Amino acid sequence: LVNHGSQGRANARIVIGIALGGIFLDAYDLGALAFGIKDITREFNLTPAGTGMVASAITFGAIVGALLGGYLTDKIGRYRVFMADMLFFVVAAIACALAPNEYVLAGARFVMGLGVGIDLPVAMAFLSEFARLKGPGNKASSVAMWCPTWYAAISVSYLLVLFFYAVLPESHSDWLWRLILGFGAVPALVIIAIRSRYMSESPVWAANQGNLKEAASILRQSYNINAHVPQDALSQPAP
């Protein structure tokens, strides 16, 4: 139902675009540190172990986030998780930009990794759920869009490095890595605004949780589908 009709297809395209926006941010934050690790090592006088700690913190955070993400999604819903994980990106990006030492930077990158680990599986689930079963924009092509989105994010980070390098005065070239990491808060705030405006909870998730009344309400409000749940279905215990 959610993928048929003009209203359903319009909403599905918006959800797919928003999910790809999250993947774009995941890729940007995962790759952004690569451009400034030498400057960070020099500024904080890092040992090889310290450099490894800073560089790997986001990966360890992503592992923990991926493990927590599935549990949280089952408990509170995809939409709530999808909105909350963006807060990790905003807070962590600002903390990275202002980090006074390697420990704060590593901690902020770990928190950012939590956001990546939570966001990516949920984004892929939305891509799969809201894609067509066949024809243009089918599941295979929609899910595969994560790949060019990922490459685009890395390309944008390269362009940002060139831009900031060109505009920063030479006396403040040490700000470059801070600006690149801190810039991640900008798309995160944009994504939060768009998600809050155009997204709702997944009706499929609500139905799978046994909450048929909520699923029907989402279909009516977000997809203009006149869905109602028979009274006898409401009286049956959830599976």
Give, region by region, the residue ranges found by the protein language model:
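Transmembrane-helix signature of 12-pass secondary carriers
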Residues: 1-239
